[in-house]
Amino acid sequence: MKLDIKGSMPKKIDVMELFARDGIQAIDTYLPVETKVWFINEFIACGYKHVEVTNFSHPRFLVQSKDAEEVLAGLKRVEGIHYKTYGMTPAAAKRAVAAREKGHPVDSMALTISAADLHGMRNSGRTRDEYKPEIKEMFNIFKGSGLKLDMAIACVYGSPCDGPVPVENTVDLIKWGLDNGLRDFTPCDTTGESNPVRSYEYMARLVDEFGK
């Protein structure tokens, strides 16, 4: 397939820095609060405008998440920076709202729903349909708080458990999210298997369905 993209590329892109959440969550040795805060501030000083700063998941699953509120308390809001957090449950959503009410820099929280059910079961113990009621509850918790809920969609190209994943799975999840008030979605190439052609075809399908 030959792609003619001359003149259609965006003039700029936004890059989100994920070190303080995704980058260290698999490290078993706990990193102290001051280390995380230092890295976050350094990334902001480098010019990143979107930074994912912490995880509200239970520390029995991820040792790095046991200090979420302390990390947020250690940060001073910088104008023009979007501070993003992560959480998978209504309890996490309540913690994010509480942190924002205390004046800590929290602008949004992401959750992850998998486009492939077997991966979803192994990653979070839920199928897509089983997780949807919790997502609705999280959205309702955020109402009036000023926080945005970002639905990250895992395995949009393929799953290590399920194999190839059709783009229709993404389309169906975004449609459901829109119908239930969500406006922020992040498709994720969890397996790192995409290429320029597949990415173009995938995004073209989403643009055809939802517009730019």
Describe these PLM feature segments.
Residues 49-74, 111-126, 157-161, 186-197:
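Glycine-rich, proline-tolerant flexible connector loops at the mouths of alpha/beta enzymes
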Residues 64-69, 93-101, 161-173, 195-207:
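Distinct, well-ordered alpha-helical segments
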Residues 18-37, 82-91, 121-128, 155-169:
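Active-site mouth loops of central-metabolism enzymes
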